[in-house]
Amino acid sequence: MKQSPPPDADDAALALTALAWILGDEARAERFLALTGLTPDALRGALEDRATQAAILTFLTGHENDLVSCAAAIDSDPALLAAAAARLDGTGF
């Protein structure tokens, strides 16, 4: 079976930066944890996991207002966040 390449360091950094933005708002953080099924401890333990990084960015792509707001807050572009999500979850290039 062909192994996936390791996530690009920029994608991982983007996911962690986005996570900081997500966790900056209690309601948004609670929604993220509820939708991903992660507990705070599980999230802390899985930050280096490609699937967790993908889940962070996929959470944003599922909520356009959050995607646009996060991109603006972290000085990025919504399309870059979406592309990183696709690469991390294996659906993109």
Predicted regions and their residues:
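Metal- and O2-centered redox machinery and metal/ROS homeostasis
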Residues: 1-93
